[in-house]
Every structure is written in structure tokens, then in C-alpha cells.
Amino acid sequence: MLMHFDSERPVFLQVAEKMEDAILTGAFEEEQQVPSTTELSVSCKINPATALKGINLLVEDGILYKKRGVGMFVCTGAVEKIRSKRRMAF
């Protein structure tokens, strides 16, 4: 997953937004596993703590969930949650 970041906003917010974009476009479907924070940090060349902070935002919003010892997965209904959140922000 290739990501380019701007210097206007914190990187962890951009990570969360790009993951949401990937879910909306179908790159990650509901109940599908997403890259780990380590994979994300290596592919994006960012600190693992930054990747984790972005992912944790999505967990808090109910877009991703963690399966202990397995990884992170897209929640059922995540697409609608993202759309609703973005409509509210607009």
C-alpha cells in the first residue's frame, strides 16, 4: 500500500484517512485482514508507533477490529460508518 504524506496534517491522521480510502474503494473488504502496523510502517517508511496510532483511531471508530494473535480486520458495516462520518464532517 503506497502512501504519500503532506506536511500539513499529522501523519497518523493521514494513515487513518488513507486506510479509510482503501476500504471505501474496495481494496480491503469487510472482514478482510489489513496490513499489520509493522507492514504498514515498513511500506510507508514511517515509525511503527505512528502507524499504530493511525490504526488505533480506526479501531476506536469501529472501522477495524483486532483479533488477538491474528491481526487487524475490517469491521462489518465499516463502509457505511466511513461514509456517515465523512458526511457529518462535510
Question: Model-derived features: where do they sit?
Answer:
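Beta-hairpin "wing" of winged helix-turn-helix
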Residues: A27-F28, Q32, V59-G69, C75-T76
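Extreme N-terminal segment that seeds HTH/winged-HTH DNA-binding domains in transcriptional regulators
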Residues: M1-Q33, E39, K85
